């Protein structure tokens, strides 16, 4: 068993499913690190990654600087805990074009990855567009969303410590092939999410692809959406993926109580056990 441990700064969450601090990297002493590792060992759980998903290319320069500074703290914590992995976003200047954002990526990200290399940590970027509703309009908050953009990012930053946290669900609502990129980018896949999404064609037909995505799709537990998990896991085995796979729960139907949240994990685990040992 494993867990992707969230490491947001302490304080009020700025968005849904963010702001959680399983590990306070600001106060991570050697003693606290030893306690965390001992706690995990007692329960038979490994840390797959330390997670912090900010916008490191935020148009607000003060927020950008704070996000980058905290990301570096998460990298240091990953080294201290012997995890060697950080999962995150590259971010995006929401009101700028893809081309402008690639130039911003060229400026911001090589130093971050160089820092990670110095501390023997890999950085895995999730392919979530962070484009859901009016708060993310017009371009979303993460550039790293499609195979075409991945290629261009890897041309700019070919470091072996820079790779992908692959989530098939984000391709579902973009109506893209979520299997083929696994083969093309097999050497860049460092971490994997198991999350599903349900696309509602009748809603899409009414509002169109230019609408806010949450108007025509909904995150679901694995097996309750449109991902073919047999095909997905088959592709992962084809490419020889042997890294961590983490269930990510964002299904609103399983909110409201601690028991419902636990049910979401139990059901996801039970469903995926037919594919994963």
Short names for language-model regions:
Residues 3, 20, 25-28, 45, ...:
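Extended aliphatic helical segments
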Residues 33-49, 55-163, 173-174, 184, ...:
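Active-site acidic/histidine proton-transfer and metal-coordination neighborhood
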Residues 1-2, 7-11, 41, 82-84, ...:
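Histidine-acidic metal/acid-base catalytic patches
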Residues 4-35, 96:
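Glycine-rich, proline-tolerant flexible connector loops at the mouths of alpha/beta enzymes
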Residues 24, 29, 94-97, 196-200, ...:
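Serine/threonine-rich low-complexity intrinsically disordered regions
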Residues 9-14, 30, 48-52, 86-89, ...:
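Short amphipathic alpha-helical segments, especially helix-boundary/capping motifs
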Residues 26, 54-55, 79, 220, ...:
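Flexible, active-site-adjacent loop/turn segments at secondary-structure boundaries
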């Amino acid at each position: 068993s494993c867990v992707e441990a969230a490491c947001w700064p302490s304080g009020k969450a700025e968005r849904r499913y963010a702001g959680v601090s399983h590990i306070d990297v600001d106060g991570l002493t050697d003693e606290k690190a030893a306690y965390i590792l001992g706690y995990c060992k007692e329960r038979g759980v490994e840390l797959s990654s330390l997670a912090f998903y900010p916008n490191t290319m935020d148009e607000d320069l003060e927020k950008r600087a704070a996000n980058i500074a905290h990301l570096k703290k998460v990298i240091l914590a990953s080294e201290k805990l012997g995890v060697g992995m950080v999962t995150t976003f590259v971010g995006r200047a929401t009101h700028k074009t893809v081309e402008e954002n690639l130039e911003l990526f060229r400026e911001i990200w090589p130093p971050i990855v160089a820092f990670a290399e110095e501390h023997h940590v890999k950085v895995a970027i999730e392919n979530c567009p962070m484009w859901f509703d009016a708060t993310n309009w017009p371009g979303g908050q993460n550039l790293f969303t499609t195979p075409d953009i991945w290629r261009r990012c890897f041309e700019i930053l070919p470091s072996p410590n820079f790779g992908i946290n692959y989530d098939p669900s984000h391709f579902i609502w973009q109506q893209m092939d979520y299997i083929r990129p696994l083969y093309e980018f097999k050497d860049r896949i460092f971490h994997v999410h198991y999350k599903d999404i349900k696309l509602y064609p009748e809603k899409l037909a009414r509002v169109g692809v230019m609408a806010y995505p949450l108007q025509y799709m909904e995150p679901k537990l694995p097996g309750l959406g449109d991902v073919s998990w047999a095909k997905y896991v088959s592709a992962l085995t084809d490419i020889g993926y042997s890294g961590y796979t983490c269930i990510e729960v964002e299904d609103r139907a399983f909110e409201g109580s601690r028991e419902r949240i636990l049910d979401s994990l139990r059901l996801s685990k039970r469903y995926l056990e037919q594919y994963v040992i």
